[in-house]
Amino acid sequence: GLGVNFIENEGPVFTKPIDSPVDVNNLAHFNPSDLDYVYKAVTNIKNSLPDHIPLIGFCGSPWTLAAYSIEGRSSKDFAKTLNFIKANKSETHELLSKYTDACFLYLRKQVQSGADVIQIFDSWANLLKKDDLQAFSFDYVASLITALKIDPVTKNTPVIIFARDPDCDSEVLMTTGADCISLYWTMNNFDIEMSKNKVALQGNLNPKILLEDKETIKKETFKLLSKYKNYPGYIFNLGHGITPDIDPDKVKYLTDIVREY
């Protein structure tokens, strides 16, 4: 294995990152049972929830997994990763294929364990320009979703795709086959008329708004809700994760005003 550890305030760190094509060839086949503790947690959480509250399972996209495992840890520019894929294109595609297969098995087990919805996080989509984004990320996301949609266990499970600040237009995200597109907070030019009645949309609010006063939070939130109020299947959410500097009371205020809208 690659020896991954999750370090507080840093994220995943690999003790044996991928440094060469040989490392890709030597990568062990993923065994879903190695993550039994995840599936047990999914089952326990599902059993603790009221019936009307769905549980979302998730995984990183094949590209995001590749970026972390080549770089070895989070980075400002992922220079090692970008240099690797440029110099080793065929091995990169081999790695992405392996990760796609692993993600499918991992998500399938999550659904078997109680997950009602699946979300795929392409957290490092912003590293790639348009053509590379399609070739190294979205093509593999599409393959993953296709596999989920034809498997008897997962075929009826809704799939959400989140891509961080992607260099693409609306149609490209829709071609992944996802049932719902989670919008990064900068994606303000997304063609909602084109996607209407085809996919659900989620998110788009800048999470840093929660650092502002309540009046500003309400103003920006209502602006967003007004934009999507006639969109069938819009799910209110932030356009990225909540950071530690955000006051939980502001989060409660946000959820309260959304429900009152």
Q: Language-model segments: which ranges?
A:
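Active-site loop segments of alpha/beta catalytic cores
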Residues: 34-261
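Glycine-rich loop at the start of a catalytic domain that most often binds anionic cofactors/ligands
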Residues: 1-10
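Short, conserved acidic/polar surface loops in the N-terminal third of protein domains
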Residues: 1-2, 17, 66-70
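A gly/proline- and charged-residue-enriched helix-loop-helix capping module
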Residues: 9-48
